[in-house]
Amino acid sequence: MAINRSSDHESDENTRLYHPYQNYQVPIKSQYLYKLPTSPEFLFTEESLKQRRSWGENLTFYTGTGYLAGSVAGASAGIFSGIKSFENGDTTKLKINRILNSSGQAGRTWGNRVGIVGLIYAGIESGVVAVTDKDDVWTSVVAGLGTGAVFRAARGVRSAAVAGAFGGIAAGAVVAGKQVFKRYAHI
């Protein structure tokens, strides 16, 4: 039989007691409560010191959210182009078909493009962080600059330079806006 110690029932600062049936008013002995951590657990202490996602998590996050945002925006734009393509005498079924085809085509196209931009950005940002061992505004600006340049490189040097400048400015504005939002909006 297990010995009940008072320290087993006390919650330290890194754990909290979890009662799986607390909403059902089921009496349960405190020795059967679970101790859950209040912060993420890491296998290596070096991982816990870094306050950022890993390169794989960044790759998945930026690519996935980029694809989702691009698909939604493209589908929204496709709805309007589908409505514009209506002709006199179209039945309701044909109108719905035009809207669905147009929004699906635009959603796929925009989703793929923005997803690729997220993929390139995540790769460059993770590479810059690995080389410089810093994660600041300039890291995002360099990643945005590189993303724009790589994304438009096939269209020529001038197009790549313009897209790189736009990407760097956009990434810097987003990061600066995020810091301003964190400072003034207490959420």
Swiss-Prot record:
InterPro entries in UniProt: Tim23-like
Superkingdom of origin: Eukaryota
Chief subcellular location: mitochondrion
Gene Ontology MF term list: protein-transporting ATPase activity
Entry annotated with the keyword ATP-binding: no
Tissue specificity statement from the Swiss-Prot or TrEMBL entry: Expressed in roots, flowers, cotyledons and leaves.
Cellular compartment(s): Mitochondrion inner membrane
Membrane topology: Multi-pass membrane protein
Keywords: Membrane, Mitochondrion, Mitochondrion inner membrane, Transmembrane, Transmembrane helix
Spans through the membrane: 63-83, 111-130, 137-153, 160-177
GO biological process: protein targeting to mitochondrion
Gene Ontology cellular component list: mitochondrial inner membrane; TIM23 mitochondrial import inner membrane translocase complex
Function comment: Essential component of the TIM17:23 complex, a complex that mediates the translocation of transit peptide-containing proteins across the mitochondrial inner membrane. Links the inner and outer membranes.
PANTHER family the UniProt entry points to: SD19278P (PTHR15371:SF0), TIM23 (PTHR15371)
Subunit record text: Component of the TIM17:23 complex at least composed of TIM23, TIM17 and TIM50. The complex interacts with the TIM44 component of the PAM complex.
Family affiliation: Belongs to the Tim17/Tim22/Tim23 family.
Stated name of the protein: Mitochondrial import inner membrane translocase subunit TIM23-1
Organism field: Arabidopsis thaliana (Mouse-ear cress)
